[in-house]
Amino acid sequence: MARRSIRTLVLGLASAAAFLFPAASARLAGESAPRTQASAQAPSVVAIRNATLITVSNGTINNGTIVLRDGKIAAIGANVQVPAGATVIDGTGKFVTPGLIDAHSHIGNDAINEGATAVSSMTDMGQVLNPTAIAIQRDLAGGLTTANILHGSANPIGGGSVTIKLRWGVEKGDDLIFEGSMPGIKFALGENPKRQGGGAGGLQGNQSNARYPGTRQGVEYVIRDAFTRAKKYQKDWAAYNAASDKATRIPPRRDLQMDALVEVLEGKRLVHCHSYRADEILMMIRLADEMGFKVATFQHVLEGYKVAKEIAAHGAGASTFSDWWGYKIEAEDAIPGNAGLMTHKGVNVSINSDSAEHARRLNTEAAKSVRWGDITDDQAIGLVTINPAKQLRIDDRVGSLDVGKDADVVIWNNHPLSTFAIVEQTYIDGKVYYDREEDMKRTAEATSSTSDSQPAVTGNLFDIAPEAGKVVFNVNGPTWAITNARIHTVSGPVIPRGTVVIRGNTIQAVGANVSVPSGARVVDARGGNVYPGFIDAQTDLGLNEPGVRNFDDVSEILTFNQMLRTRVAYQSDSDAIAVARTEGITSAGIFPGGGIIGGEVPLMNLDGWTWEENVVRAAAGQAFSFPGGGGGGRGGGGFGGRAGGAGAANSGLRELETLLAQAKVYGQNPNRDMNWSLEPFLPILNKQQAFYISAGNDNAITQAIAWAQRQNVNIVIRTSPMTAVSSAAALKAANVPVIISTVLTLPQGGDNVFHAATYQAPAELEKAGVTFAFSSGGFETVRLIPFQAAMSVAWGLSKERALQAMTLDAAKIFGADKLVGSIEAGKIANLVVTNGDAMEIRSRVLHVVIAGKDVPLQNKQTELFNRYMGRQ
């Protein structure tokens, strides 16, 4: 019944003539209308000419032609004749690849978990497919054509999986299914099926609600017991079917749970096993060997690099994340070189998404393994094409550009492993299911009446407060130089071939004709690039540690925490700090949470023996969650506000206003006794510091700006990219800068919003003249700041402004632009040296300089990579 009602709703939506564009989001709207099977039709013959064809199976063909006929690849090569009557597409400057394949997806599902039982093999994801789910269209826009739709990980043995093609808008869920593909089944190991207190297994709040198992050994037993029963069930049916008197016998009881497991034993159903730790991966290999079946893929497999030899020997594939880590205790030893290391050890590896958002950019997720896994470009593209095709046993149909295979192809405007690559068209079975030009035409129509661009705020946003003087410029330390580099000063023009001289912790000189002092150590950059150190404008790095140490000092319990010196809790030896700084992040705004006022916001360097040595600016202001501002607390998806209705919000503001009024009186008394509840507000009232206001919607931003004007204080807004855009006029008019949460997230506002709205948001802010900075929000993704900038450039932001947003503009937002943010004589020597464009994922960081120190490019993850690469 539920399925029919959902289908009815879906078909009603699909019959609409077009999506409507909300006026408040006109700039970011422009989504295409839902496609029906008819609207996705293409001419029977299509020829793409003069393109770079990345075949995957037979190398790369420059200036080649590929012909699509009747849903298949009919011809491909450098000298292919275009058939008469074919629709010809000029591929000059374009790249063509096979459609991307995601071996772990949950898009287009009405539900993913059946958690009531430890074995739910009787369920099947093919029964709950929604062909008009907007996630399908958004992932098509990223070049995805095939996905393995998996059950969730609530059970040691979960439900059946199904492989689909992303034929968005077909009438029935069954029309998505990849014809002839093998069915699968989801297994799950580790914390998900056993976790206690709100998870799938273990104790569910109290003993009476416990669901077995609650341990890893319990998970192993559930699977072992199920297959023991399945083998007996298989034997009973075999005996019955072979009996000469079968017609008079009573058949064995039909068991839908066992039917699926017998298919596994007979090699008719693929096992896809959710896993994290090396011990549980090895356990599953040994158990599968004992029971007589093969694991098709280990999913997630974050510690697969530790047992790569065993995975390869078993013949299993490994489908992993590119660089996810630290988000749960099982992910503490995850490394971004996992896919590369397993590839080197002979495992068939794919990169998956497990996320409708990550599936939009599987191409650049694969490119990360070039940077961190030491694999080639061809191997990286294989991670999202032929390798998952082999894992799903569909490589005879898709995964490479070969004659006779399905015409699932993608046209890109740049090399698909480039951070700046965008999909132009996506074909499935020779039909166009996504066309960027159509989407951009609609976007242009929606934005035709918008205002002209405005210049951004320039100069210092805030005076530097007295405590910033704790940063000591030391020119008595070692002198060394970086030479033969392309120097991106940010504050001035690029120096094509220049030198930076560093003395102590300070930049002594920079220019094209700078002399290196006698005796100085010289680093020859050999044509590399030198940038100011990158700044993450909001994170809890150093306050929140992943893994077994698992300290969390982000949020205090009071409503007003202005007396808290956040810097004193900064754990300078955090594993997460080293992970971030080796990728060029040299400084970060460290934000506490909790209450209305969370505490002081320091700007900290990412290297130093102690927190004192890490300080750039001890306190740039106070973290302020605007009452009633909405949002969602810690993390990269959005900035939170205080819970409660309008009454609670007004009460909170009134209480803060009372504190500020008291602080004004307090500050006028030269003989005052110290009051730590009022003292921290004095530099804010003197406009030496700012309130960093978290506001989750347009109304909250409008109210926050008006409130700040009444109080005569400086503010910085912290909000999502799309909310910043919809409030851009107000931000510009008040000269209020904004820290945006990650752009690498799904657009807000429902299905009608343009699929790339978050990627485009920084360009819209640039056009509106709003000063902004990028942020991660959490410790796990700090290293991705340059790639947020790159995605924004791909969708319209100028490269100059992108670089500013993660250097000088970020420094201005913290009132620290006289200290960091650009390469100028007299500033702190925070620098990054790369062998290519810093925003390109495949570029490598060669040197990171923090306060004049050439910091070793080592962290826990590089150490694990090197250690296990040496395992024989």
Predicted regions and their residues:
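C-terminal cap of metal-dependent C-N hydrolases
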Residues: 51, 402-445, 485, 824-868
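Polyanionic/metal-chelating signatures
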Residues: 140-295, 299, 416-418, 422-423, ...
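Bacterial N-terminal signal peptides
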Residues: 10-23
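Divalent metal-coordination and catalytic microenvironments
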Residues: 51, 66, 71, 93, ...
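Histidine-rich, glycine-flanked metal-binding segment
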Residues: 32-38, 53, 57-97, 491-531
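N-terminal pre-domain segments of enzymes
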Residues: 28-43, 444-476
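His/Asp/Glu-enriched, well-ordered alpha-helical/loop segment
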Residues: 112, 118-123, 270, 309-312, ...
